[in-house]
Design a protein with these regions (language model features):
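Transmembrane helix-loop-helix hairpins at membrane boundaries of multipass inner-membrane proteins
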Residues: 1-10, 20-128, 208-213, 504-509
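Alpha-helical multi-pass transmembrane bundles of energy-transducing inner-membrane proteins
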Residues: 125-132, 136-222, 240, 312-379
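Interfacial segments of multi-pass membrane proteins
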Residues: 282, 334-343, 415-437
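Short helix-boundary/re-entrant hairpin motifs in multi-pass inner-membrane proteins
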Residues: 104, 110-121, 228, 232-296, ...
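Cytoplasmic/organellar membrane-interface segments at the starts of transmembrane helices
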Residues: 210-211, 258, 375, 386-391, ...
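Structural signature of hydrophobic alpha-helical transmembrane segments
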Residues: 3-14, 84-92, 147-159, 227-240, ...
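C-terminal ends of transmembrane helices
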Residues: 20-28, 97-114, 162-171, 242-256, ...
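Predominantly late transmembrane helices and immediately cytosolic-facing juxtamembrane segments
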Residues: 245, 359-363, 435-471
Length: 512
């Protein structure tokens, strides 16, 4: 379905453009009014994506009319289809609700910074950067063109860098710079590959908004000697963004020390976009070369799952544990993609949504504990908090269920799809490889379950700690956004077919 006006892109550009006014409005309006404006700006793209998803049932792509066309660059449009919808809905849901959560949390953070005599820009600047970051992420997953994708990818990097540098914890400026350098280098490596493809093919479109078809094999226009190196460059650049083992160094620092509302966007939403781009961009442009690279990607995915799980298990800082957990979860995402099966890739896209819900709940739980326990993040100093904070404990449990695949969580369906795709793919190659896969998955799933529920026990149950004696339940201004995210996750567990069925249909065609 081609729209008459570019509604999808308006959901990206309107929030970005209007967010520039927030620092000026912040001088005359109160923090609640600024929060409400930011919430409404982000509610708009969420409403658009949900409306078109329900209206079409994702049985056909929803495409904006071309808003820009050039003989050398191709055309700029926006696409909502079964592949992009799980990400667009997840980004819209989490960013909108975390905007509301930011009000009470950042009140606490501003008070902390004032006590520490740290100066930072005010509410208007915070929400301007927050809205830009959120809308740019939406822009990346709706893009149809390599240049368009790269612009939004970089636009998501700069505001998130400033949010960490201005409002983060610890050595926030140094950590923000590390985050900027690592992820910008990854984006540049991806850009180099993109430029070679676009200049060789005469277009940067990886999806044709006129024919409503992906430009499969567009990379074949590249010289045969360069095809594999270019494909490797694009994949490697995305691996940095995905924080795969070996290029993950930046993530535990950035995600742990970012202000918690930003952590709740970085970990579930931003990094997973690179997994989507592996399928939407890298596989579309270089199907043969990508297929060859999956022989190396699959074992790397398993190593990432295990490494992230082991490191999470060793952490005492709750936010740092969640950061390493995200590395492990991105391993599952890569595992599904590297199978190049319908089930595996469908599972990876559904896992993005499951991880978005689960990790958003867990980072916001960490934020609640920071606010209610006066900045406490050390798990060893917690314990026995559940009787004092039963609602927070319940929401944290739902979050852990999503990342471990326990019903009623969407993570159950993503895990089943990824494992079935991986088993089918590896079994067709060799029995020994299949046994190795089973062993690695048992270790990985065991580690995920261990760090999730040991952490749950250490924080919320057991002997009451000194912190537990002083604890009290958070207010609804913190808990209500979390409860809505949790409810959305359970709804998708009950109604997964709205995402999975169209995905299976599209991937069956895409993979041939």
């Amino acid at each position: 379905m081609v729209l008459n006006i570019p509604l999808l892109l308006s959901g990206v550009l309107v929030p970005i453009v209007l967010s520039v006014l927030l620092p000026f409005l912040g001088r005359s309006l109160g923090k609640k009014s600024i929060t409400a404006i930011a919430f409404i700006l982000l509610l708009y793209p969420l409403a658009l994506t949900v409306f078109f998803t329900i209206q079409t049932g994702l049985r056909e792509p929803v495409v904006d009319p071309v808003i820009f066309q050039s003989d050398s660059l191709g055309s700029f449009s926006a696409l909502l289809d079964p592949l992009s919808a799980p990400l667009a809905i997840s980004i819209g849901l989490v960013t909108t609700l975390i905007a509301a959560y930011s009000l009470p949390y950042m009140e606490h953070r501003f008070e902390e910074m004032e006590k520490e005599k740290i100066s930072a820009p005010d509410w208007g600047t915070y929400y301007m950067l927050y809205v830009m970051f959120s809308a740019a992420m939406m822009g990346t997953v709706l893009s149809t063109n390599l240049v368009e994708f790269y612009i939004f990818l970089e636009l998501s990097l700069l505001p998130s860098f400033l949010l960490i540098a201005f409002y983060g914890y610890g050595n926030r400026e140094r950590i923000a710079l590390m985050y900027l350098i690592w992820t910008h280098v990854g984006a540049l490596v991806f850009l180099i590959g993109s430029l070679i493809v676009g200049l060789s093919a005469g277009t940067f479109d990886f999806y044709d908004p006129i024919s409503l078809q992906p430009n499969m094999g567009l990379g074949s226009a590249v010289s045969p000697a360069l095809r594999l190196p270019v494909a490797i460059a694009m994949v490697l650049g995305l691996f940095v963004k995905l924080a795969i083992l070996g290029v993950h160094i930046w993530l535990p620092y950035a995600h742990a020390e970012a202000p918690t509302p930003v952590s709740a966007l970085l970990s579930p939403n931003l990094i997973g976009i690179a997994g989507y781009a592996l399928v939407r961009v890298a596989y579309t442009l270089f199907p043969d070369e990508f297929s060859h690279l999956t022989n190396y990607m699959l074992p790397l995915a398993l190593l990432t799952i295990i490494y992230g799980g082991l490191m999470a298990l060793a952490q005492d800082d709750f936010k740092r544990l969640l950061a390493y957990s995200s590395i492990s979860q991105m391993g599952y995402l890569l595992l599904g993609i590297s199978t190049l099966t319908t089930a595996g890739i469908a599972g990876a896209m559904v896992h993005y949504a499951a991880h978005a819900v689960g990790k958003a709940l867990l980072f916001t739980t960490a934020g609640v504990l920071i606010v209610q326990l006066h900045g406490l993040r050390s798990i060893s100093k917690m314990g026995g908090i559940a009787p004092k904070m039963p609602l927070t404990a319940s929401l944290a449990l739902i979050g852990f269920m999503h990342i471990t695949g326990i019903p009623p969580s969407l993570g159950l369906w993503s895990e089943v799809l990824i494992i079935s795709g991986a088993a089918g793919s590896v079994l067709s190659k060799s029995a020994i490889a299949f046994i190795g896969l089973l062993i690695a998955l048992l270790i990985g799933i065991g580690l995920s379950t261990a760090y999730a529920f040991l952490t749950m026990k250490r924080i919320f149950f057991g002997q009451p700690s000194e912190a537990a004696l002083k604890a009290k339940e958070a207010g609804w201004n913190l808990l209500a956004p979390m409860a809505i995210i949790a409810a959305a996750g359970v709804l998708l567990f009950i109604w997964p077919s709205i995402l999975i069925d169209p995905l299976v249909s599209l991937l069956s065609s895409l993979l041939g």
